[in-house]
């Protein structure tokens, strides 16, 4: 998949493994690197959703439209589809199989 970042600061924080580990610690840093590699290698968001360890799911409430992917409890990688027109199913839900571009919003504790 094609990845972009919500800010230049975030892009710098997630630029390489050494920087990620320095910013987020060894355990979280390695897990973040793994998730970024999985996102890059996946053809679409549905592929990532099939990996049970990611616990990828859509959020609701004030974070509606965002997608959460587990990093290491309690942290989550927050994403949004980066398409000009967000792929939707006929029922209005997100069509995970057609999402091929994602914007990373950040790594946060959503709880």
Q: Where would I find each of the regions flagged by the language model?
A:
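A short, surface-exposed loop/turn module that caps and links secondary-structure elements
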Residues: 44-65
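Enriched for short, Lys/Arg-rich terminal
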Residues: 69-111
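Arg/Lys-rich, positively charged N-terminal/basic patches that mediate binding to nucleic acids
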Residues: 1-37
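Charge-dense, helix-prone N-terminal extensions
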Residues: 6-12, 23-27, 54, 97-111
């Amino acid at each position: 998949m094609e990845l972009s970042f919500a800010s230049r600061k975030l892009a710098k924080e997630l630029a390489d493994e050494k920087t990620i580990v320095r910013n987020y610690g060894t355990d979280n840093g390695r897990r973040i690197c793994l998730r970024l590699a999985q996102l890059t290698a996946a053809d679409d968001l549905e592929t990532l959703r099939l990996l049970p360890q990611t616990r990828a799911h859509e959020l609701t409430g004030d974070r509606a439209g965002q997608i959460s992917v587990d990093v290491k409890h309690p942290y989550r990688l927050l994403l949004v589809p980066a398409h000009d027109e967000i792929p939707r199913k006929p029922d209005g839900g997100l069509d995970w199989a057609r999402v091929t571009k994602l914007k990373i919003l950040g790594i946060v504790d959503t709880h």
